[in-house]
Amino acid sequence: VTLHFVLPGDVDDPTSPSGGNVYDRRVIQSLAKLGTAVREITIPGTWPQPSHTARARLDQALAGIEDGAVVLLDGLVACGVPEVVVPHAGRLRLVVLVHLPLADETGLPPSVAARLDAAERECLHAAGAVVATSPWAARRLAGHHGLARVHAITPGTDPAPPATGTDGVSRLLCVASLTPRKGHDVLVEALATVTDVPWTCAFVGPERSGGPVRDLIAQHGLADRIDLIGPLTGKPLDRAYATADLFVLPSRAETYGMVVTEALARGVPVIASSVPDALGNGGLLLPPDDVTAFAQALRRWFTDEDWRRDLRSRALTRRTELSTWDETAAELVRVPASLRA
């Protein structure tokens, strides 16, 4: 049985890496290893709010798939356009993979968020099955949209050697696109309270709306301490993790937080918000949008050697519990197998 996988057009764009794109690509690689035939269908467009041309291209792609076939749709492509997807639901076995509920993206005008939310609900109710990338996200989707069942299939990790770090204390790393949802402003404000101790912090990720963060860094005089590195993938990203002493992610909302497990796979201590499923007991979970909590945690990190040792130990323990991408793919392939043709 061939699995048709509908993906956003930028799934392999190195200038816009995202957790969703990495999940899609790694699952495809593991499905191939497991002997599942996958046909990739990439649809360029400004998803989830595409042009008429992109909608027509998606409709055409779905129309070209034989009746009864299994189609896995990335939610970024599917959820905003139920008028395209729903008419095909009767003849195709549709599985929608939701990386982030559309209305959860920070900074959307309320009217746009409401429209996307309604579109997503219509699309998910028409699907044969819905998959979320964490238990929290599965519960949220089921409750919010009134769905009977949402499968939770968490991202895998790649085995990696433990990070050597820099000096065990001073090199901080944040891997996240510069968008309001990722909370870089919270981290900058917190870092501004600990300028009396030596540290540098690398911000790795595409600048989708980086202007306000740059302004805030300049306002606090931290341009010589915070490096805006831009997007990294492959070996350069591996090097960034390997030299990190502490990983920090101040997100306002995450469905899972794959970058957290990438840090934990290397035994890097983590201080983060909005990532309970990814973090487990592997680090310190803080409330989102809480500058004071992040400032206090950073102060403790820099001044309390025993606590640093404890965080490191917790990260190394969590490292042994993380699942692989092959396990993720094996779980995912069982979902459409349960759907009747």
Give residue ranges: language-model regions:
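Short alpha-helical donor nucleotide-sugar binding micro-motif in glycosyltransferases
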Residues: 231-232, 239-244
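Conserved acidic donor-binding segment of nucleotide-sugar-dependent glycosyltransferases
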Residues: 283-292, 300-305
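Nucleotide-activated donor-binding/catalytic signature segment of Leloir-type glycosyltransferases, i.e.
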Residues: 213-232
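Glycosyltransferase donor-sugar binding loop
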Residues: 175, 200-214, 230
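Membrane-proximal helix-turn-helix segments that form the acceptor-binding/catalytic region
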Residues: 102, 111-130
